[in-house]
């Protein structure tokens, strides 16, 4: 009997087993589409970024002008640029939803997959931050100055590290050059990490909405889930294209339409909207080093979740109190994003501090509330 090429060919067989004939649980919901959406977002970012890099000049005298040139003179350059900028926002929306899904349904129990996913999140955040610096507008320059300056909080060696990162005594041409280099290289490292992430995921198989072993009830990924993924592909592309064609600069900062000027500080320095929750956590700690630690912890705290003692059920589906806590945390993250945009004055300072405490409390108390619920069920 002749086997099809996808099963015979050694190279195509690998792709086939991880995409076409992959056994997937029958009951996975739309929340499981986010992984493929993230893959699509990454491809959009790499392709649009590649075309942008053909026309961009990483020099402080010409960077701003080269971005203007892309938007005005390059064929469809305005579209490529807005797709790249707004594509990053879509990427982060999908990523935060993906992480939220993992927390809610207990996917963090797959330790290797969860850890590589958290590393990918860090890498993408670093890539996005460096990309924000490249247009060399006011917010690009001052954002880079403020965020890189946080490294000076490291005891003893902080100042030396900052000057090493800057390549001088201030954010200058050397900084822009190295940020451009890393912004170009990091997405390919992210791609490699995604391959490892998928490798670990396919070792265990996907989780599902009820958190039970689904080995007895699986179907091939194609055609069932490929068509299902296509629906969300189309929805995401429609949202992205509508955003780019109707209000392309809605999510940007007006200060970035002004070329970088080291002598004029913007009234309110802030990062892109998808970093505002972490920025609010940073600002809510009065001490500089404490703020930096809280900033890093706001993401790295995800890494403690696989070490939770196992509860009777996987995920929050069967824990009403944990569901309430989860949705409170979602609201808290939205409020922190809002606080990050506000000036540093009362009542925003106190509000930010209270929200920061609630945010970290979720990760500390979540497992204990679930254990308490287990005890109630037992009795």
UniProtKB/Swiss-Prot annotation:
Q: TM spans, by residue?
A: 34-54, 78-99, 114-134, 179-199, 227-247, 289-309, 321-341, 348-368
InterPro entries found in the cross-reference section:
Cyt_b/b6_C, Cyt_b/b6_C_sf, Cyt_b/b6_N, Cytb/b6-like_sf, Cytochrome_b, Cytochrome_b_C_euk/bac, Cytochrome_b_N_euk/bac, Di-haem_cyt_TM
Miscellaneous section: Heme 1 (or BL or b562) is low-potential and absorbs at about 562 nm, and heme 2 (or BH or b566) is high-potential and absorbs at about 566 nm.
Name the coenzymes or cofactors required: heme b
How does the cofactor attach, per the note?
Binds 2 heme b groups non-covalently.
- Taxonomically, the superkingdom here is Eukaryota
Q: Which gene encodes it?
A: MT-CYB
Q: How does it assemble?
A: The main subunits of complex b-c1 are: cytochrome b, cytochrome c1 and the Rieske protein.
Family designation: Belongs to the cytochrome b family.
State the annotated membrane topology for this chain.
Answer: Multi-pass membrane protein
Cross-referenced PROSITE patterns: CYTB_CTER, CYTB_NTER
Annotated positions binding heme b b566: 98, 197
Q: What does this protein do?
A: Component of the ubiquinol-cytochrome c reductase complex (complex III or cytochrome b-c1 complex) that is part of the mitochondrial respiratory chain. The b-c1 complex mediates electron transfer from ubiquinol to cytochrome c. Contributes to the generation of a proton gradient across the mitochondrial membrane that is then used for ATP synthesis.
Where is the protein situated, by its record's location annotation? Mitochondrion inner membrane
Binding sites annotated in the UniProt record for heme b b562: 84, 183
Q: Which CDD domains match?
A: cytochrome_b_C (cd00290), Cytochrome_b_N (cd00284)
Q: Which GO terms describe its cellular component?
A: mitochondrial inner membrane; respiratory chain complex III
Q: Which UniProt keywords apply?
A: Electron transport, Heme, Iron, Membrane, Metal-binding, Mitochondrion, Mitochondrion inner membrane, Respiratory chain, Transmembrane, Transmembrane helix, Transport, Ubiquinone
User: Where along the chain is a ubiquinone bound?
Assistant: 202
What processes in GO biological process is this protein linked to? Answer: mitochondrial electron transport, ubiquinol to cytochrome c
What is the protein name given in its UniProt record? Answer: Cytochrome b
Q: Which GO terms describe its molecular function?
A: metal ion binding; ubiquinol-cytochrome-c reductase activity
């Amino acid at each position: 009997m002749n086997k099809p090429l996808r099963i015979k060919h050694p190279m195509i067989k690998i792709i086939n087993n991880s995409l076409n004939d992959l056994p997937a649980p029958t009951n996975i919901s739309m929340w499981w589409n986010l992984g493929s959406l993230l893959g699509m977002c990454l491809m959009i970012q790499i392709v649009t970024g590649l075309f942008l890099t053909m026309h961009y000049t990483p020099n402080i005298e010409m960077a701003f002008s080269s971005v203007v040139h892309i938007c005005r003179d390059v064929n469809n350059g305005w579209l490529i640029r807005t797709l790249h900028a707004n594509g990053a926002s879509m990427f982060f929306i999908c990523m935060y939803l993906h992480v939220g899904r993992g927390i809610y349904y207990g996917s963090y129990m797959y330790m290797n997959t969860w850890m590589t996913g958290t590393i990918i999140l860090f890498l993408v955040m670093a890539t996005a931050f460096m990309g924000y610096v490249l247009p060399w507008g006011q917010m690009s320059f001052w954002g880079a100055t403020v965020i890189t300056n946080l490294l000076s909080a490291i005891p003893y060696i902080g100042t030396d590290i900052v000057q090493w990162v800057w390549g001088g005594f201030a954010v200058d041409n050397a900084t822009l050059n190295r940020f451009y280099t890393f912004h170009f290289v990091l997405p390919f490292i992210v791609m490699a990490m995604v391959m490892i992430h998928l490798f670990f995921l396919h070792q265990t198989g996907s989780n599902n909405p009820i958190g039970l072993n689904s080995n007895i009830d699986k179907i091939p990924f194609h055609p069932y889930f490929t068509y299902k993924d296509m629906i969300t592909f189309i929805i995401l592309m429609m949202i992205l294209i509508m955003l780019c064609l109707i209000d392309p600069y809605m999510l940007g900062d007006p200060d970035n339409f002004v070329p970088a000027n080291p002598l004029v500080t913007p009234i309110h320095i802030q990062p892109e909207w998808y970093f505002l929750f972490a920025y609010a956590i940073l600002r809510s700690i009065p001490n500089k080093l404490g703020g930096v630690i809280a900033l890093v912890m706001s993401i790295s705290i995800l890494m403690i979740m696989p070490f939770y003692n196992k509860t009777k059920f996987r995920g929050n589906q069967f824990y009403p109190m944990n569901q309430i806590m989860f949705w409170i945390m979602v609201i808290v993250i939205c409020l922190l994003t809002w606080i990050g945009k506000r000036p540093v004055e009362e009542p925003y300072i106190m509000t930010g501090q209270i929200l920061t405490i609630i945010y970290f409390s979720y990760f500390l108390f979540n497992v204990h509330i679930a254990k308490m619920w287990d005890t109630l069920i037992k009795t």
